[in-house]
Amino acid sequence: MTDEKNPSYLNLNKLTKAGSVLNTPPTFSIYVLKLVTEWMVKSGGLEYFEEKSKRQSNVLYDFIDNNSSQVNCKVEKTYRSNSNVVFNFTNEADNENFIKLSTEKGIIGVNGHRSVGGIRVSLFNSVDDEMFEYFLDFFKQFLVENK
């Protein structure tokens, strides 16, 4: 493996020139990658996670679109992410209240990017259906209580 595109620790030319002491590969990161990959394969593979991602994001976007008097997503439907759903409340004070209350309910990291604010819900692979439903129930209740 002498291709310059390979990481240094897999590039035999670089390793030979450095007397095999070029650097230590990030062994813990590689090990965690192995564990995550095994978990994903065991859970159903890429097809399963793609389907779950699309299903969860579609449910959340539909909910947002159907409650446009209180919440809106400014991203055009064509460009919406399946991983990070971003939106704002029409009442700006609700953004901070939502973040505060969600944290109290154990839902963390929903604050939007520091440059744009709002809310960002990450639907990464580790977010299973039970977690998603917990969040969605919280979101529905929040809208009812903040009409």
Positions of predicted regions on the chain:
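Conserved PLP-binding catalytic core of the aspartate aminotransferase-like
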Residues: V71-S102
